[in-house]
Amino acid sequence: MIHPLLQTYGPLDGWMILLIMATVSIGFFSYQVQKATRLVLIGSPDSRFDSWGPRIREFIVGWLGQKKVLRDRIAGTMHVLMFWGFLMLASDMFDLATANYFSSELLPGFIVGPWNGMVELGYTMALIGCVSAFVRRVAFTPEKLKGKSQLEGNVILILIFTITTTSFMIESKEDPSPFWEPIGHQFNQFGLSVNTVVVAYWLHMLAISVFLFLIPLSKHMHLVMAVPNVFFHDIGPVAKMRPLAVGDDGKAVPLEDLDIDSFGVSSYTQYTWRQLIDAWSCTSCGRCQDVCPAYASGKGLNPMQVIHDVRDYANEHAPLLLSGETPKETMMQRITEEAVWACTTCNACVDVCPLYIEHVPKLTDLRRNAMMETMEYPDVLNTAMGNLESTSNPYGYGEHERADWAADLDVKIGEPAEYIYFVGCAASFDERNQKVARSTISLLKEAGLDVGILGMQEGCSGDPARRAGNEYLFQMLAETNMMTFQELGVKRIIASCPHCFHTLGKEYADYGGEELEVFHHTEILAKLQEEGRLPRVEKNGQSITFHDPCYLGRIGGIIDEPRDVIGGVDVEAERSGRDSFCCGAGGAQMWMEEESDKRVNEIRAKELSETGCDTVAVGCPFCSIMVKDGLDAVGSEMDVKDVAEILWEQIVAKDNEIQEKVAKVN
């Protein structure tokens, strides 16, 4: 057979036709990619050129290994088949375009068989993946795809189907090996005519050309942008927020030395270049919207739409942006205030995204600008922010009342100790959560730990202020707490609030707290049980489930320890562990009014009540409040107790039992 490139089609030779197709398609593709690249590079600087070893390892696992893609078993498997298939067959594109045109062979003879076998395997995997995906879309449409246009996705699948099937037809005329290329060999047995194969060849090349046209105009731009997006994703502590400014020593610039023209993000170019790559990396898979508590409760936030908004803004204002001008439309106007202030910062969207898109920082950066520059933030936050500034707690109680809950406990207050129990605002002032603080300190003393509390010297960790966007107030609180830690020589901290645990343990490192060892109380309690210094929980017929707080499980990575403390759970909630559903209090939502027909905590409470357990164990003061309110709202009589309460109640009950027995003997 004369290769299609060497044939003449009217006035043009085959190679001339291919040259025209390649020039047009590759030229258009290249233009669109460089335009998107320019729109990315006008972003602000970002220090993502560190830790090359970890980045390379993460890239291999995350991009090549498709680690996060496979968390959705069905859709993930289909995607992996197409992804790995295309990786193996990409090299064949050049071969098909040049075979029999160049006189020299590119591969040694002994490699040809295995190479062709690998290429055929790649086409086969891609074919299976695309057919499976098409059937799923048509016959078993996922809920998130219902009611949405699937034209773009279906066209891409048809193109992949065309590319793969025509490759087998072309292969059939190249004397395929029955061992290395069984499918091509089978097509060879069909006896396809020369004209059929020639048509297949040009359909193959046409499909590739159309594919190149569509990639930069669709969500499939992720085929290009995913590579830098995954490689340069944040490999630091999960959900750690950046300081306003970082000095040469890598630490946050002190408040008195700050010299900043603008706070947070108002315009497109104030986002960093890494944040902007996200905009062209989104595949519109919908995983982020599926796990978003704000979206689930009917609020105006869809994390996927936030990413689309950034990309659409860039494309619509490209001439102005690329000429160095700033469009009148702000990013807050495009993304909307409702979306920005609905976020609970639970990080579920970031955690589940297969391409490591960072949704939450885009919203918190907008909050920073609204809170510290334009002053256009929800009025309801004024009370909490004012209280934090004047009394170092969002409730507005006096500092002298912080340790009232411990008045009858023999505990060090404001004195050096091996461990400092950082009580947190909720456990200091909320009557319900004061029981948690009493249980925790009693357990630690029971185990013989040298532990103390800061009392009136303790201030809020600053989490509510920082997540609300008031970075200035957060830094004031952080610097004040760090001064206290340094004065008392604090090295080890125990926190029962996951928000304090995260902020003190991960974010205070930028303010001189890099040597602090911060533990969640469930970690310490589990360790003390393992050492035999505290007893194991005996449930005595009581059934327990556990609600994983976002900042403890998904963000903090502490999943097993709370369960160990309570002797395991009897029934897991529908969403648990790393995939737990938010209670609705994070991201400063605790201090805002939830305005929607469905409430986040009620959605979660319903899931927990469906376990049929007697008790919901928690490990967060905010979760304790929100879950209890949610259970009351859905008519459930389940108890809500912190793991420390469950363990301490058992110890007290046993002591009472012993005392009763002694009394009877006497």
Where are the model-predicted features located?
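Iron-sulfur-cluster electron-transfer modules
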Residues: 2-132, 139, 270-279, 301-307, ...
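Juxtamembrane inter-helical linkers in multi-pass membrane proteins
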Residues: 40-63, 144-154, 181-187, 224-255, ...
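Hydrophobic alpha-helical membrane-insertion segments
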Residues: 80-90, 155-175
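Iron-sulfur cluster-binding electron-transfer modules in prokaryotic oxidoreductases
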Residues: 187-197, 240-248, 254-255, 260-263, ...
